[in-house]
């Protein structure tokens, strides 16, 4: 029997459509499966569906409704081992209640920084 290894999956939570599309394309080009969510509610649906998700990358300021920090707290309760990367251009890490095992990327970030951060969590050499 042959075991097929799947590509690592990223749950990308970004409310800015253009940035979400660019990040989805960039991560897909790097060989990741991307589950894109425009808001916290949609991200929670992905998590509750049982989808294979290896890491969550979320904006903090998600517009209307739940913010990324609250989403991360809920995600951590559902999946305590899920690594979480926060991103924000308006807040600093000190203003955000982060969950254990998470990290913060200030906007603007580069794709190289995103790659390196994901690779650090997933233990692969994609950066």
Predicted regions and their residues:
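Charged docking surfaces used in two-component/phosphorelay signaling
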Residues: 21-29
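Hydrophobic/aromatic residues positioned on beta-strands within the core alpha/beta folds
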Residues: 85-87
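Acidic, metal-coordinating helix/loop segments flanking the phosphotransfer/catalytic sites
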Residues: 36-55
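Non-catalytic signal-transmission and effector/linker regions of two-component phosphorelay proteins
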Residues: 1-12, 17, 30, 41, ...
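The feature encodes the CheY-like receiver
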Residues: 63-65
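Negatively charged, flexible loop motifs adjacent to catalytic sites
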Residues: 89-93
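Active-site residues of response regulator receiver
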Residues: 59-60
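Short amphipathic alpha-helix used as the core "switch/output" element in two-component signaling
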Residues: 67-82
